[in-house]
């Protein structure tokens, strides 16, 4: 921590526990790294939590593990990742007793504490990352609560870089501080005096480049905006919604989608199909606005063709699955959509009337092998335009300017949005814009031609099938078989087309590098770029800059930017054709006559994500921010402040008057306004002196007693309480711990947290049957709505209920749903029919209850409602015994009884839990049972005390005729 404000933040947090809220990109990871380094050198037991996700936790572990290793921390003192699969329970106690820093999911630490594997009094403290996500139902809150109940001296350090998420709700900051058991709040925005003085003292040499979009791109963006507005207006009109506050589907698409989702969530189940299609269209159009600025012209046009083909196939019924019906895009039939496709097509190619007196110009490339080839027969000529991305030309000019600057030579670092842009720019610099786009266009034509051939074959076979309808049966069968075969081929072609247009970013696992280009001078304009070499980095944590590559001296690897006929066919461009370090070391002696070392400068293209260490490892002289981002610009400022003597020139590229520029500015303004709200709220923040829990823990569940207190007041006595004795008894009963046994897998949910808040003593066990054991006779299988549907489809639920029914007297199926997410058990269209399908969810529930008559189904609308239901079920019953759980009673031993026969016997009249075992002990099978007399039934069932009522029912069941 070389900067002064880092030291100040570290000292403040070291002296007092608190929540640190820091601006994005200012290096909050350096503060966390300082604490990890500080406690790694000691024997203290420190827990590291991440409130965001397990993936974020794993990425943090890899990052901090490598950084601490670089700092010289002993390997034995490095942090340890605690995983259920890798660390057995028998070794955890010894592991925790040795101390150290441990990364792990909060649910694992809670289980280790409740099972006494982790001595909570030995834990020195907890470090929490992404603390803004903690709530009163999160498992992190339960861990902090258990920690503070048994450890009054341990520290709690919380960190976050999302100030906007602390002010998006009223009282969110105060609740977050309460859940974290903290009293101090440390705010460090970019405009903080200490930070501004340090970062503004040594700013980088900034060159801002505002790039204008082409006319076609402006037309596309305008069409997308108009389509979005049309969809929003239709959505409001159809559902009679109020105006969507906070957004209009404009440039700030991220915030608008959140507002749209929040306002439509309570009524989602009531929306008709057309409304859901409009919501899907709004999201897609906002995504296309971002894709317009990132993708090349051919990729963007092919994406539009894929969307159109997908929507058309759904309309034609090629996909019978109802899950894909929402993907139909109604906006494709609008006039704005035609303008969108027209402008996108003009970026790739355009049509020109063919002059019969003159031959077509030779400089223009003509390809007529795609879906529009038929237009060539009508005196039209297709001319490729292949419009370059405007940022490509500016990037080329920047690199040319850097190369001409002989005084400053060093590594060039280009920051891009994601790995898709990394591959795009690397291929552009390798092969030139024309060759790169031409290869993409030829792939598009080949795919389109393939689909056209399939469509024509299908139409021909359909016509042949219709003309032969009057033939004999054999001919009809042959025609039907051929139609089926062609239909399957058509689907396969569609799947192939879909796979080829999958533009998701692929996560790489290693560093990809290419620097193979011609060393000699001369040639096309792009050859100057290749002299620099190109290195691609995927953002992996363990970044190791490889040794310099070798370049071909005879110029066999060169490539031009213009229409070189030998470079037109680039369907299979491979940028990973560089030699490996091992192979170079083996053959280095034989290559000296043909290769020489690549001279600087080098070009490193890196995605913005996971770029925390790339600046220190590369130490670039020139930095190009290709896609604007708040975090990366501030990382560059911090890097320059840490290295004031290192010259750094920063090129910052943005599209002028675009959604990209608007989103960047809006994020800056949103962060600034959020910090200003936090500063004002901090001055008025009400903090309980006992909130830290070092004296007494505050339990939020006690607030629910106010409803009970209201019922004990008498209005005629001036509000005085009545029945003081009953109130005291009620309070004593509530103070007594209620025990509940929970399956260890259920700690991934929030229900154990709510149960603990309401005074339950939680005992975690790995249950073989059920999820919750409330008493010796009550066992609950808990399902969410989605899990319920999946369990019915797989048959797992039937097996689970069958196991509970054999062991417990009162098996219960609890169906829990989210109150903020409405749902329907039956599709609205099916309710209009005269009968329900036997495969519908209500029909399956009815079948389940008829199969298991003792099963009870309970619906719960929230975790808090579930807790009250558990209180009612447990009332008057003894607490469960953990030693008896997972133990099958002796009377139900599977060695003595046939469970299938037992299930049949339970459905007969007169058979109950008191006499079923007596019957099975004295009768061999059902046939023997049906031949018994009434007196024998009474003797076996010991039913004389009941006036032979049950025996008579069972005897009549076997002996009465059906017509009686």
Swiss-Prot record:
Residues 739-819 form the ERCC4 domain. Its EC number is 3.1.-.-. Heterodimer composed of ercc1 and xpf/ercc4. The keyword RNA-binding does not apply. It comes from the Eukaryota. Its cofactor is Mg(2+). Keywords: DNA damage, DNA repair, DNA-binding, Endonuclease, Hydrolase, Magnesium, Nuclease, Nucleus. Residues 483-492 have a biased composition (Polar residues). It is an enzyme of class 3 (hydrolase). GO terms for biological process: DNA damage response; double-strand break repair via homologous recombination; nucleotide-excision repair; nucleotide-excision repair involved in interstrand cross-link repair; resolution of meiotic recombination intermediates. It comes from Dictyostelium discoideum (Social amoeba). Residues 462-482 have a biased composition (Low complexity). It is found in: Nucleus. The lineage of its organism: Eukaryota, Amoebozoa, Evosea, Eumycetozoa, Dictyostelia. This is DNA repair endonuclease XPF. Residues 360-379, 459-529, 545-571 are annotated as: Disordered. Its main location: nucleus. One of its GO terms (molecular function) is damaged DNA binding.
């Amino acid at each position: 921590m070389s900067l002064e404000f880092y030291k100040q933040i570290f000292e403040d947090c070291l002296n007092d526990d608190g929540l640190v809220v820091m601006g994005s990109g200012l290096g909050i990871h350096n503060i966390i790294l300082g604490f990890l380094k500080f406690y790694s050198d000691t024997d203290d037991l420190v827990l590291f939590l991440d409130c965001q996700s397990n993936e974020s936790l794993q990425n943090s572990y890899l990052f901090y593990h490598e950084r601490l290793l670089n700092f010289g921390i002993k390997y034995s003192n490095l942090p340890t990742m605690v995983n259920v699969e890798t660390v057995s329970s028998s070794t955890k106690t010894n592991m925790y007793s040795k101390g150290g820093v441990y990364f792990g999911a909060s649910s694992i630490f809670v289980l280790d504490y409740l099972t006494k594997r982790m001595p909570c009094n030995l834990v020195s403290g907890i470090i929490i990352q992404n603390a803004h996500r903690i709530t009163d139902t999160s498992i992190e809150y339960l861990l902090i609560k258990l920690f503070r109940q048994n450890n009054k001296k341990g520290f709690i350090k919380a960190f976050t870089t999302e100030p906007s998420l602390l002010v998006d709700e009223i009282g969110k900051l105060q609740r977050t501080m309460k859940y974290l058991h903290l009293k101090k709040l440390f705010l460090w925005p970019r405009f903080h005096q200490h930070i501004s003085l340090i970062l503004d003292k040594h700013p980088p040499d900034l060159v801002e480049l505002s790039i204008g979009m082409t006319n076609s791109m402006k037309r596309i963006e305008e069409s997308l905006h108009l389509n979005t507005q049309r969809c929003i207006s239709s959505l409001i009109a159809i559902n009679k919604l109020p105006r969507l506050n906070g957004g209009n589907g404009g440039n700030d698409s991220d915030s608008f989608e959140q507002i749209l989702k929040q306002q439509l969530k309570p009524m989602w189940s009531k929306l008709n199909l057309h409304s859901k299609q409009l919501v899907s269209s709004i999201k897609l159009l906002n995504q296309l606005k971002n894709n317009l600025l990132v993708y090349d012209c051919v990729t963007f046009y092919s994406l539009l063709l894929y969307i159109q083909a997908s929507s058309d196939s759904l309309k034609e019924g090629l996909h019978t699955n109802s899950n894909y019906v929402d993907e139909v895009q109604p906006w494709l039939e609008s006039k704005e959509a035609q303008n969108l496709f027209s402008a996108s097509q003009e970026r790739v190619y355009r049509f020109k009337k063919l002059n019969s007196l003159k031959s077509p110009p030779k400089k223009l490339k003509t390809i007529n092998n795609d879906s529009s080839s038929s237009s060539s027969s009508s005196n039209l000529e297709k001319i490729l335009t292949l419009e370059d991305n405007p940022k490509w030309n500016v990037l080329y000019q920047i690199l040319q300017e850097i190369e001409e600057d002989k005084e400053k030579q060093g590594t060039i670092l280009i920051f891009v949005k994601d790995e898709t842009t990394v591959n795009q720019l690397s291929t552009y610099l390798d092969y030139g814009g024309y060759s790169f786009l031409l290869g993409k266009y030829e792939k598009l034509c080949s795919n389109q031609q393939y689909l056209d051939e399939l469509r024509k074959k299908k139409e021909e076979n359909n016509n042949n099938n219709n003309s032969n309808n009057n033939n004999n049966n054999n001919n009809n069968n042959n025609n039907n078989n051929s139609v089926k075969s062609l239909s399957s081929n058509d689907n396969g072609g569609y799947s192939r087309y879909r796979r080829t247009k999958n533009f998701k970013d692929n996560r790489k696992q290693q560093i990809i590098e290419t620097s193979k280009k011609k060393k000699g001078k001369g040639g096309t304009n792009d050859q100057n770029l290749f002299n620099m070499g190109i290195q691609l980095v995927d953002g992996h944590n363990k970044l190791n800059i490889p040794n310099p590559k070798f370049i071909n001296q005879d110029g066999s690897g060169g490539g031009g930017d213009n229409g070189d006929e030998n470079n037109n066919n680039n369907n299979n461009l491979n940028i990973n054709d560089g030699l490996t370090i091992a192979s170079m070391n083996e053959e280095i002696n034989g290559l000296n006559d043909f290769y020489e070392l690549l001279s600087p400068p080098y070009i490193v293209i890196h995605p913005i994500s996971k770029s925390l260490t790339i600046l220190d490892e590369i130490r670039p002289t020139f930095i190009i921010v290709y896609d604007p981002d708040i975090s990366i610009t501030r990382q560059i400022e911090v890097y320059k402040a840490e290295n004031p003597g290192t010259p750094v020139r920063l090129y910052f590229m943005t599209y002028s008057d675009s959604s990209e520029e608007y989103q960047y500015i809006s994020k800056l303004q949103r962060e600034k306004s959020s910090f200003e709200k936090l500063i004002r709220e901090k001055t008025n923040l009400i903090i309980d002196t006992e909130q830290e829990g070092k004296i007494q823990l505050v339990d939020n569940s006690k607030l629910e007693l106010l409803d009970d207190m209201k019922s004990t007041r008498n209005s005629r006595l001036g509000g005085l309480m009545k029945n003081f004795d009953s109130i005291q008894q009620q309070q004593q009963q509530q103070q007594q711990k209620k025990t509940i046994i929970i399956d260890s897998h259920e700690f991934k949910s929030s229900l154990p947290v709510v149960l603990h808040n309401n005074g339950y003593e939680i005992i975690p066990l790995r249950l073989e049957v059920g999820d919750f054991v409330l008493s010796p006779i009550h066992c609950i299988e808990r399902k969410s709505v989605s899990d319920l549907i999946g369990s019915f489809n797989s048959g797992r639920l039937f097996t689970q209920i069958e196991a509970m029914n054999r062991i417990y007297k009162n098996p219960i199926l609890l169906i829990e749903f989210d109150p903020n997410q409405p749902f329907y058990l039956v599709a609205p269209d099916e309710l209009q029919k005269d009968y329900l399908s036997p495969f519908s969810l209500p029909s399956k529930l009815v079948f389940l209850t008829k199969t298991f008559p003792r099963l009870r189904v309970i619906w719960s609308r929230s975790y808090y409602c579930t807790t009250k239901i558990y209180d009612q079920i447990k009332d008057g019953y003894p607490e469960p015994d953990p030693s008896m759980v997972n133990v099958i009673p002796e009377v139900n031993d599977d060695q003595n009884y046939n469970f299938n026969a037992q299930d049949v016997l339970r459905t007969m009249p007169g058979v109950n839990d008191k006499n079923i075992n007596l019957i099975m002990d004295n009768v061999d099978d059902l046939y023997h049972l049906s031949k018994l007399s009434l007196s024998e039934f009474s003797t076996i069932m010991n039913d004389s005390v009941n006036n032979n009522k049950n025996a008579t029912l069972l005897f009549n069941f076997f002996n009465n005729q059906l017509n009686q």
